[in-house]
């Protein structure tokens, strides 16, 4: 590609509304342009990277035995009503009616569509297992799209769905997808981890996320220092304390706390250790519990894990917190004064709360707290469960080492769905015994456009993007100095351009009438890994200058050796 025939579209200024570095650099490098909130046009440089990612994904899916299909973005509402997700999915599901007043959705995912397809195409166990994938646009009506393509409303995704008659067969495909995903992200030179995860709205049993490590990531992922245990913080189990509860040393007393409406204010004003305080959170109770609200207790320095809480049978799904109006109607006090003593609601305490003694909590009276609370003296020990997020230093759930926490960007997710969709949609085949059998399913997704942003978060400096070779828009940039005035500079540039292209190298020849500084800055900004500078002075000694974008080193290479040298440097 020649820059004179290309839309480079680079920008010097950083857009004010771009929060994360990947969004900033994708705009500055001319990869994307915003059309509307959460909607982006991909420009030529962005498309080249997107296609590189897409091709790696497609190759590894094919290598793993998956079969490519293409399903419609627009889906009939009756399939979502049949699966039960019409009500469950929420406002992220964009719904509309056609001119015939028939309801449809823009697909955020395709479990319903693929299940409908396969129940009409597959009728015997002999045809299974099969694994189908597509790389296609999805739409989720995010309440607050942000971070550019990292959390956009429209995005490119690879989604795959496998069908089986046994759990053993599903496990084999699941393992194959785990391996394929590891190969995909390794080929892109991404620093990633596969972590245990919650299945979320997709449903099913076993699940792993593939997380690219980055400070800008939205997810907290935990690792053991003593084993290969890794999990999303939502999934990570907080082990119950093994030490017994200390005996009571304080009397129960009620204290005026008019200016302490949060744990932080309580700790600051009364110089309490935060680990000696308890937060009381009221959530809506399951309708079969006989109560409207249920109280959840966590230690003052811990955070409630909403995923764990939502799985409790006493808690309504999805988990929702009580409003201040509801709290006052039930308790007679505001949210900042809640506590377990004399509380006329079901109470569930975290394991760490159950071993506390002499602790402080709200008195269920505005502006008052109890200090010196002790279980089995001042109140009965409630139900106990794992309710909190793990913290650094916790014992690993496998008992080996302690936990560390890092930030990650989720770029892939694999699920063992089981019969969640096939059973309700009556997707059956004739089994080996001649009877109809519900198919078992797996589901495997990669956020293709999100991978592009995640790669930038890991690969950049103050001058721009530093692409790994495998997904760079161009692998080599040829920068001829004054080629429009020097015949031999132009001749070598054209010869090198033609030769590299014949070797299958993606190369960009900067044939603009621009100052060298502009040419260098643009190629650094868009992240070309290998740069060749051709100048008259160096040609006197039959040399050109090579610069590696990642390490920044320059070296002189003989013109007769440059092609062989570049082929040895490019990771293909």
Curated annotation (Swiss-Prot):
PROSITE patterns: AA_TRNA_LIGASE_II (PS50862). Keywords: Aminoacyl-tRNA synthetase, ATP-binding, Cytoplasm, Ligase, Nucleotide-binding, Protein biosynthesis. InterPro entries: aa-tRNA-synt_IIb, aa-tRNA-synth_II, aa-tRNA-synth_II/BPL/LPL, Anticodon-bd, Anticodon-bd_dom_sf, Pro-tRNA-ligase_IIa, Pro-tRNA-synth_IIa_bac-type, Pro-tRNA-Synthase_IIa_type1. GO terms for molecular function: aminoacyl-tRNA deacylase activity; ATP binding; proline-tRNA ligase activity. Signal peptide: none annotated. It is an enzyme of class 6 (ligase). It comes from the Bacteria. The keyword NADP does not apply. One of its GO terms (cellular component) is cytosol. Gene3D superfamilies: Anticodon-binding domain, Bira Bifunctional Protein, Domain 2, YbaK/aminoacyl-tRNA synthetase-associated domain. Its EC number is 6.1.1.15. The keyword Transcription regulation does not apply. GO terms for biological process: prolyl-tRNA aminoacylation. Belongs to the class-II aminoacyl-tRNA synthetase family. ProS type 1 subfamily. Catalyzes the attachment of proline to tRNA(Pro) in a two-step reaction: proline is first activated by ATP to form Pro-AMP and then transferred to the acceptor end of tRNA(Pro). As ProRS can inadvertently accommodate and process non-cognate amino acids such as alanine and cysteine, to avoid such errors it has two additional distinct editing activities against alanine. One activity is designated as 'pretransfer' editing and involves the tRNA(Pro)-independent hydrolysis of activated Ala-AMP. Consists of three domains: the N-terminal catalytic domain, the editing domain and the C-terminal anticodon-binding domain. This is Proline--tRNA ligase.
């Amino acid at each position: 590609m020649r820059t004179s025939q290309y839309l480079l579209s680079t920008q010097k200024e950083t857009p004010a509304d771009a929060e994360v570095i990947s969004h900033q650099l994708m705009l500055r490098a001319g990869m994307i342009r915003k059309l509307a909130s959460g909607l982006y046009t991909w420009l030529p440089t962005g498309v080249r990277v997107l296609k590189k990612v897409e091709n790696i994904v497609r190759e590894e899916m094919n290598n793993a035995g998956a079969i490519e299909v293409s399903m419609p973005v627009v889906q009939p509402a009756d399939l979502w009503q049949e699966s039960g997700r019409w009500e469950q999915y929420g406002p992220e599901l964009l719904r509309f009616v056609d001119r015939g007043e028939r309801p449809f959705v823009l697909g955020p995912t395709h479990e319903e569509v693929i299940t409908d397809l396969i129940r009409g195409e597959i009728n015997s166990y002999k045809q299974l297992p099969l694994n189908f994938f597509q790389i296609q646009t999805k739409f989720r009506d995010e309440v607050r799209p942000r971070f550019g393509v990292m959390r956009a409303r429209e995005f490119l995704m690879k989604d795959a769905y496998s069908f089986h008659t046994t759990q053993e067969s599903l496990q084999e495909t699941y393992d194959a997808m785990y391996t394929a995903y590891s190969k995909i992200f390794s080929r892109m030179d991404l620093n990633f981890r596969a972590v245990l995860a919650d299945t979320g709205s997709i449903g099913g049993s076993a699940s792993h996320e593939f997380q690219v490590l980055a400070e800008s990531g939205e997810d907290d992922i935990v690792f053991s220092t003593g084993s290969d245990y890794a999990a999303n913080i939502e999934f990570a189990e907080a082990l119950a304390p093994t030490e017994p509860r200390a005996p009571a040393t304080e009397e129960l007393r009620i204290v005026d706390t008019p200016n302490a409406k949060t744990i932080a204010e309580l700790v600051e004003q009364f110089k309490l250790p935060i680990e000696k305080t308890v937060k009381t959170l009221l959530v809506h109770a399951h309708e079969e519990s006989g109560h409207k609200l249920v109280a959840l207790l966590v230690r003052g320095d811990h955070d409630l894990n909403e995923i764990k809480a939502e799985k409790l049978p006493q808690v309504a799904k999805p988990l929702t917190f009580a409003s201040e109006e509801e709290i006052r109607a039930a308790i007679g006090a505001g949210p900042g004064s809640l506590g377990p003593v004399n509380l006329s609601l079901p109470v569930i305490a975290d394991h760490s709360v159950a071993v506390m003694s002499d602790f402080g909590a709200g008195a269920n009276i505005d502006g008052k707290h109890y200090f010196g609370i002790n279980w089995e003296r001042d109140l009965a020990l409630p139900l106990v469960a794992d309710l909190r997020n793990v913290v650094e230093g916790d014992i690993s759930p496998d008992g080996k080492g302690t936990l560390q926490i890092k930030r990650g960007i989720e770029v892939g997710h694999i699920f063992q769905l089981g019969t969640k969709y096939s059973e309700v949609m009556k997707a059956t085949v004739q089994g080996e015994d001649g009877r109809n059998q519900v198919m078992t399913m797996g589901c495997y997704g990669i956020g293709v456009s999100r991978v592009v942003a995640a790669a930038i978060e890991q690969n950049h400096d103050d001058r721009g993007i530093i692409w790994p070779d495998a997904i760079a828009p161009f692998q080599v940039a040829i920068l001829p100095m004054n080629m429009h005035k020097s015949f031999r500079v132009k001749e070598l540039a054209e010869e090198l351009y033609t030769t590299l292209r014949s070797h299958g190298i993606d190369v960009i020849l900067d044939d603009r009438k621009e100052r060298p500084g502009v040419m260098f800055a643009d190629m650094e900004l868009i992240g070309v890994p290998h740069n060749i500078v051709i100048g008259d002075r160096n040609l006197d000694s039959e040399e050109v200058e090579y610069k590696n974008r990642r390490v920044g080193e320059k070296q002189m290479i003989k013109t007769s050796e440059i092609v062989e040298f570049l082929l040895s440097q490019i990771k293909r």
